[in-house]
Structures are given as C-alpha cells and as structure tokens.
C-alpha cells in the first residue's frame, strides 16, 4: 500500500495505515464508514458482504488515517472465498496497526482465532468491542475486555457503538499513536481510492443483497461495462452486467416482469446520483457465467484480484 507516490514534499505531516479485521458481520464496514464520514463500504446484515479490501481515508490536519476494511475471515467454499480470506490475513502485514473488532458476547470462533494467531506474527494491534449498546451489565463489558487482553496480542482494548456513534474520538486518539512521520499518501479531501466504476458496482451488489433471498446474491458479480459522461449535460450513462451462476438464478434476479431488477436498479441509481453529484442513466443486464466463483480467469476479469503486500 505504501508504495504510492507521495503527494506532498514536506514532512510536517504523518499517516497511519490501519487494517480493520474481524469475523463476518461484526461491524467492520459500518465502523469504517462512520470514521470516514462517507459511505466507502457497502453494509448489509448478511455475512461476507465485503469481498475485497476497501480503503477509507480521513485527514485531520497534519495526520492522515488510512483504513483498510477487509473481508470477514470465514471457512471458504470456493476460490473467491479463499481470496477473501487471504486479503484479510495479508492486510495485517501491510499496515502500521491492526484494529480487530469483536462482539460483546459469545465465545471467540475459529475464524477469530485464526486472525489472533496471524496477529502474533504481525505488527501491533488493538482490540475494539463493537455493539456496546447491546450490553446490559457493565461487568459483562469488563469481563470481555479482560478476556481479550489475556490473548496477549493487543496493546489495548477499546469499546465503540457504531449504532450510537459513540467513542469514535477515543479510537482516533488510539490510532494516532501508531502514526509514522512522513507525507500524506492521498489528497487531503479524498475519502477513498476506489474508482467511481467500482463504487457503482458495489452499490448495485448491496441492493441485490438487501432485496434478495440469502444464497442468490452471494453468487452475483457486478461489472460496469460503460461509464460515460454526456458532454454539456449533468448526465452519466452507466451500463452494467450482473453475472450469476445459474439460469434459474438469472430469473430470480430479473424477477416477474423485471420487477426485482427494476427495484435493484432504481435504488442503486438513487445512491449513485447522490455520491456522483449528477443524474445517472443506469442500464442493467443479467448474464450467466457458471461457477464463476471457482474460475480464476473470471475472478480476475471481474476485478477480484489478489491484493499484494507492499512491505
């Protein structure tokens, strides 16, 4: 990540690269969006919503925070899942500090222990207990903190409630202690390095996850084939292919009389117009690519390329 060309030539500034890690659905993307103050990662109630590493950027005066929101580690069932897990584990070696999120209750699962073991070989890390609004007894929270400290991999344990927008300043202060003096790697007004085409694709996938039954959306890939501004207007033409793995799935994505596809596209168009700041002519087509999640060529072609460590 840090092989980017610096955009400033003086060094009265500093930056901190942070890997946001944890099991699926623990709130990594929600926390990233909250800290950034913009929607850089899609959020749904379904696990494995995040598929690739998403970069969120926050610049506060001389200090720039770069958050790498990673896929939740899980037991992979296909090559896409393996790439998702590798993205999360590789990010630990690519940052100044890892920030691992936990639920306030429940035993640590296998995927969390895999990350804990990876942290033992990586750099510094802090633990963050999310969803503290669910805690009824403060003693439960203290017990959870003690449990996480006993793992021996975290410099400290913090708490946050993304739902209540609580204790974010404490997290900023904690992360700033790992900052490295040097240039900012992004423009001060940037909030992500994700191209607009990828943002559009993610928004469409988010709507599919929100509106469709559990299994089908996870077999969907969204590829923006055309993104073109109409000269002299505030209109952008966007053509999108939505790929699924079965002909039967295609019918479900389209819906009766095209109702489901229209619902997905309409909601996505509204979000796209908001973050692009212009009118959007969004055209979506549904196509079938059998078992694309296990096809290396298609994974690369659809944009699911492996992130490489840059340290």
Question: What does each model-identified segment do?
Answer:
Residues 1-97, 102:
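Conserved G1/Walker A P-loop phosphate-binding module
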Residues 19, 33, 52, 56, ...:
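Solvent-exposed alpha-helical segments within well-ordered globular domains of core cellular machineries
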Residues 27, 167, 260:
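Conserved glycine(s) of the Walker
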Residues 38, 57-61, 76, 91, ...:
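Conserved, well-folded catalytic cores of nucleic-acid-processing
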Residues 59-64, 83-157, 228-232:
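Conserved C-terminal guanine-recognition region of P-loop GTPase G domains, centered on the G4
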Residues 124-126, 133-196:
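Canonical P-loop GTPase G-domain recognition
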Residues 196-311:
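P-loop NTP-binding site
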């Amino acid at each position: 990540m840090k092989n980017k060309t610096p955009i400033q030539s003086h060094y009265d500034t500093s930056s901190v690269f942070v890997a946001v890690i944890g099991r699926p659905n623990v709130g990594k993307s929600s926390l990233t969006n909250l800290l950034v103050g913009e929607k850089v990662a899609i959020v749904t109630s379904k696990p494995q919503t995040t598929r690739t590493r998403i970069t969120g950027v926050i610049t506060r005066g001389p200090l720039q925070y770069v958050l790498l929101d990673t896929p939740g580690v899980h037991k992979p069932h296909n090559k896409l899942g393996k790439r998702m897990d590798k993205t999360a584990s590789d990010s630990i070696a690519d940052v100044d500090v890892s920030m691992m999120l936990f639920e306030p209750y429940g035993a640590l699962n296998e995927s969390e222990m895999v990350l804990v073991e990876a942290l033992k070989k990586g750099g510094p890390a802090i633990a963050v207990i999310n969803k503290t609004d669910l805690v009824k007894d403060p003693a439960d929270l203290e017990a959870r903190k003690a449990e996480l400290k006993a793992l021996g991999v975290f410099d400290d344990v913090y708490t946050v409630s993304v739902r209540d927008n609580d204790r974010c300043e404490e997290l900023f202060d904690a992360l700033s202690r790992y900052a490295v003096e040097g240039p900012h790697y992004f423009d001060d007004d940037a909030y992500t390095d994700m191209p607009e085409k990828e943002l559009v694709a993610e928004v469409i996938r988010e709507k599919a996850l929100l509106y469709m039954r559990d299994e089908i959306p996870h077999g969907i890939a969204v590829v923006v084939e055309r993104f073109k501004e109409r000269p002299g207007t505030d209109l952008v033409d966007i053509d999108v292919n939505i790929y699924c793995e079965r002909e039967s799935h295609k019918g479900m994505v389209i819906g009766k009389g095209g109702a489901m596809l229209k619902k997905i596209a309409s909601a996505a168009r509204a979000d796209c117009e908001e973050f692009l700041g212009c009118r959007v002519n969004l055209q979506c087509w549904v196509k079938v690519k059998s078992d694309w999640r296990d096809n290396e060529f298609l994974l690369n072609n659809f944009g699911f390329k492996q992130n490489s460590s840059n340290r």
